[in-house]
């Protein structure tokens, strides 16, 4: 059985790690390189580094920061934010990233998914989907882009299936309704996507307790859980989370 993964997320704006609630009201959470090293040392299975201002400000992710961060850790590392071309992906992979995350650019140009998958292998291509529930529509979600600022009107489940067909190797699925709230993952959203694709789904948005993380694996059928404010605020440690999940008999790489 493939081990379930715990993945700290470093949302970066203007060179600093930030975290907000529902994609707004951002607060400073520290230096990205320092936090990357800390989480790597504490037993993270992977890291995700997202330049959350890049797609809004129409600039590329800072390759220098990626390079410094990647050189400081020994675990797989995903980079996202403002990546809109095969050449940009190449630059980031050469700078030390193991994977790249595409979001707005993939919606705007779906061919980028297939082109990059053919060029670098689908194991390198993560598609980030920012999902928000439709008003008064249970079990229906729409895809948002531009850092959650623009509603595309695209159905999340249809888009998830399409990106898999185009060559995505993984889906990073964020519940905008749960982001930063620490009120629990959107299990209905996560399970709905996991049930219609055969590629791993990383659940994001809402982790607030040990039980939340257990539930997203057990009920949500996620392959990985993204963790941000829960760790940044030192509410829980990776060791505590892994110990709890191992006691629950989940397939987790032990804390070392």
UniProtKB/Swiss-Prot annotation:
Gene3D superfamilies: Aldolase class I (3.20.20.70). Coiled coil: none annotated. Keywords: Amino-acid biosynthesis, Cytoplasm, Histidine biosynthesis, Lyase. Its EC number is 4.3.2.10. Heterodimer of HisH and HisF. Pathway: Amino-acid biosynthesis; L-histidine biosynthesis; L-histidine from 5-phospho-alpha-D-ribose 1-diphosphate: step 5/9. This is Imidazole glycerol phosphate synthase subunit HisF. Signal peptide: none annotated. One of its GO terms (cellular component) is cytoplasm. GO terms for molecular function: imidazoleglycerol-phosphate synthase activity; lyase activity. HAMAP family: HisF. CDD domains: HisF. Its main location: cytoplasm. InterPro entries: Aldolase_TIM (IPR013785), His_biosynth (IPR006062), HisF (IPR004651), IGPS_HisA/HisF (IPR050064), RibuloseP-bd_barrel (IPR011060). It is found in: Cytoplasm. GO terms for biological process: L-histidine biosynthetic process.
């Amino acid at each position: 059985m493939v081990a379930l993964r715990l993945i700290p997320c470093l949302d970066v704006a203007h060179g600093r790690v930030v975290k907000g609630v529902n994609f707004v009201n951002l607060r400073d959470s520290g230096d990205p390189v320092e936090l990357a090293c800390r989480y790597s040392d504490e037993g993270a299975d992977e890291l995700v580094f997202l330049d959350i201002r890049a797609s809004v400000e129409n600039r590329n992710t800072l390759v220098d920061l990626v390079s410094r961060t990647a050189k400081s850790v020994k675990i797989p590392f995903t980079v996202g934010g403002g990546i809109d071309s095969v050449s940009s992906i190449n630059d980031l992979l050469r700078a030390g990233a193991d994977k790249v995350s595409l979001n707005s650019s993939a919606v705007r140009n779906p061919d980028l998914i297939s082109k990059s998958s053919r060029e670098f292998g689908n194991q390198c291509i993560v598609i980030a989907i920012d999902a928000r529930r439709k008003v008064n529509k249970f079990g229906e979600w729409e895809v948002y882009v531009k850092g959650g600022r623009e509603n595309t009107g695209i159905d999340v489940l249809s888009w998830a299936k399409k990106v898999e067909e185009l060559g995505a190797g993984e889906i990073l699925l964020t519940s905008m309704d749960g982001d930063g709230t620490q009120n629990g993952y959107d299990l209905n959203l996560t399970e709905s996507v996991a049930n219609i694709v055969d590629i791993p789904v990383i659940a994001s948005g809402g982790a607030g307790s040990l039980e939340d993380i257990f539930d997203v694996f057990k009920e949500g059928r996620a392959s990985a859980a993204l963790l941000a404010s829960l760790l940044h605020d030192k509410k829980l440690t990776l060791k505590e989370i892994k110990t709890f999940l191992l006691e629950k008999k989940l397939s987790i790489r032990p804390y070392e």
